[in-house]
A protein has these predicted regions:
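Rossmann-fold dinucleotide-binding core
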Residues: 120-211
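NAD(P)+-binding Rossmann beta1-loop-alpha1 motif at the extreme N-terminus of oxidoreductases
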Residues: 2-72, 85
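Rossmann-like NAD(P)(H) cofactor-binding subdomain of soluble oxidoreductases
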Residues: 62-161
């Protein structure tokens, strides 16, 4: 396999399913590719002296893929290499703190952040504020999104385990100025079986709103109903709830982006939500798993973001508010 054009070192912050999936996909396709996953301190013993982890990725009807992935501890002072290409794949509510923890290593003059979080529209606003405070004035924020379904199983002593539950697509937003560079980066991801493509920034913005709609519907409802995406459609009140949530997102999104009226129409958002469900029928959603593990959820960055923007615009969002408060009630018991 020919090497991709983009060969700059990549650092990945976020050792959950998507971050490890990205790292494993690239390293299994290109075993010597210069990347590293940054882990928090409590993973130090697992990483050990070898500074590598082993990841096993299982996919439907395919042989498992194994990869050795370089690993670093975020606050390890011996890791002094400058970070120029950062993939941020943490939980949305962890993103800002994660970036702040590595500010001394960020290249202030030439920093590219690939934002691959749920709730990235919300995260983007907060991230730009915090980077400005640290005098990183002109970072490239590359908005990314993926519909791949991936779940992380409990690790054993020797390796991490991932299961790909649905084959999706990955998109990366690019401007006229950086289209060629992002196209080369997307080629790397595509050759690593991530089904990746660089698209114009305006198209990416619409796609992020469509992904937000899918997350605002599927995440809280699968968590509340305790079921997979596929089983969700069999619940009697699913269609009515879905339509109300989507209508509110459409109202807010089109008010904020009048040039995207067609892409953010209720029918367009509904079609996208249904596509995501079909691509990930067996996926239980990250919010379902967070509730199951009694962990904090991303509800504030998803439905909460829609509610806050609606309040600013004078648009009521009762369906999103109902889901938001139901999830909050569940997590308040933890």
């Amino acid at each position: 396999m020919a090497l991709p054009f983009f060969m700059e070192p990549i650092h990945i912050v976020g050792s959950g399913s998507i971050g490890l999936f990205l790292a494993t996909s690239i390293r299994s396709a290109f075993p010597s590719y210069p990347l590293a996953v940054l882990f928090r301190q409590h993973h130090k013993q697992r990483i050990g002296n070898e500074k590598e982890i082993t990841v096993c990725l299982r996919q439907k009807e395919q042989r498992p893929r194994m990869a050795r992935v370089p690993a670093q501890i975020i606050d390890d002072r011996r890791s002094t290499s400058s970070i120029r290409n950062l993939v941020l794949s943490t939980k949305a509510f962890q993103a800002v703190d994660a970036v702040e923890s590595i500010v001394p290593r960020l290249d202030p003059e030439n920093l590219k952040i690939m934002l691959l979080c749920n709730g990235s529209l919300d995260v983007r606003e907060k991230l730009l504020e915090i980077l400005s405070l640290h005098e990183i004035k002109s970072p490239q924020l590359v908005m990314c999104t993926t519909t791949h379904g991936v779940e992380q199983e409990p690790p054993d002593e020797d390796m991490f385990h991932l299961v790909q539950t649905g084959m999706g697509r990955t998109f990366m937003g690019a401007t006229l100025e950086n289209m060629e560079e992002i196209r080369r980066l997307s080629e790397l991801w595509d050759r690593a079986s991530l089904n990746a493509k660089a698209i114009e920034k305006s198209k990416m913005e619409a796609f992020l709103w469509q992904k937000l709609a899918a997350n605002c519907v599927c995440n809280p409802l699968t968590a509340l109903c305790q079921c997979t995406n596929g089983a969700l459609t069999k619940h009697s009140n699913f269609v009515a709830t879905r339509d109300k949530v989507i209508q509110e997102i459409s109202d807010v999104g089109r008010e904020m982006n009048p040039d995207m009226a067609e892409q953010l129409s209720p029918s367009a958002l509904t079609a996208f939500v249904e596509l995501v469900i079909q691509e990930n029928l067996q996926n239980t959603s990250s919010m379902f798993r967070d509730i199951e593990k009694k962990q904090e959820t991303e509800i504030d960055n998803l439905n909460g973001y829609v509610i806050r923007k609606g309040q600013h615009l004078g648009i009521d969002c009762p369906a999103n508010e109902e889901l938001y408060h139901k999830i909050r009630e569940m997590t308040a018991k933890f």
